[in-house]
Every structure is written in C-alpha cells, then in structure tokens.
C-alpha cells in the first residue's frame, strides 16, 4: 500500500503547488500574455516532472498485484492532466463542488479501471 501513500503525496504536491503558483501569479502583477506564458510553462513542468514518478508508482502497484494497468505512463499522464487542470482552476474555472465531483468521478474510474475496491482511492478526495 506504500504506492497509495506515494500517490497521495503527489496529489498533495499538485494541490499545494497550484495554490502557491496562483498566489504568486496574482501578486506579481504581470501582464496577461506573460501570465499565460508562465502558466503554460508551470503546467507543462508539473506534468513533465511528475509523470515519470507517477508512472513508476503505478508500475510498482501493478508488479505488487495491487492494480491492473497495461500502460502506466499513459495512466499517469491522464491522472496528472485531470488533477492539474482541475486543481489549478484557471483553464476551466469550476466551483468547489464541481471540482469535487470531477475528482470523485476520476477516483471511481481509476478504482474500476485498475480493479481496486470502491473507496480504496478516497485519499485523492479534496
């Protein structure tokens, strides 16, 4: 189950870094174009840096028989895209409830798609 602890840490890192980046960006007073450029670089960096780590966690979980996954890196990218976009909340602005619903459905999809029992990935909830 250490894979789930590591995944929870990545989720927390996404949440914390998104909040910190948005605060810094709002305080910086940059122009719209510069903010968009920096935001794009930030999202790219976050996904690029976390994808190998997340993929390795998924591979380890599959090797340990905890999950079923044929393409760990693809699954890692899907998870990170949803988490980063929803937690960032600027590309597709959403209410807290909408974000919670999306994350809940991602959890349900992941549990079913990786043969994990219902509720086993609830640590991802906001």
Model-derived regions: residue spans:
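Short alpha-helix boundary/capping elements
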Residues: 12-16, 83-87, 114
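Short secondary-structure transition hinges
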Residues: 16-66
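All-alpha amphipathic helical-bundle segments outside canonical DNA-binding/catalytic cores
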Residues: 5, 45-46, 59-78, 97-101
């Amino acid at each position: 189950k250490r894979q789930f602890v590591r995944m929870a840490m990545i989720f927390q890192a996404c949440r914390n870094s998104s909040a910190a980046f948005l605060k810094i960006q709002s305080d910086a007073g940059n122009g719209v174009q510069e903010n968009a450029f920096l935001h794009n670089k930030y999202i790219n960096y976050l996904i690029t840096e976390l994808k190998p780590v997340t993929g390795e966690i998924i591979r380890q979980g599959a090797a340990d028989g905890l999950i079923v996954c044929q393409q760990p890196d693809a699954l890692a990218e899907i998870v990170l895209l949803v988490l980063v976009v929803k937690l960032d909340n600027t590309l597709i602005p959403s209410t807290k409830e909408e974000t919670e619903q999306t994350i809940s459905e991602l959890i349900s999809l992941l549990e079913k798609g990786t043969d994990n029992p219902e509720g086993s990935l609830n640590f991802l909830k906001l």
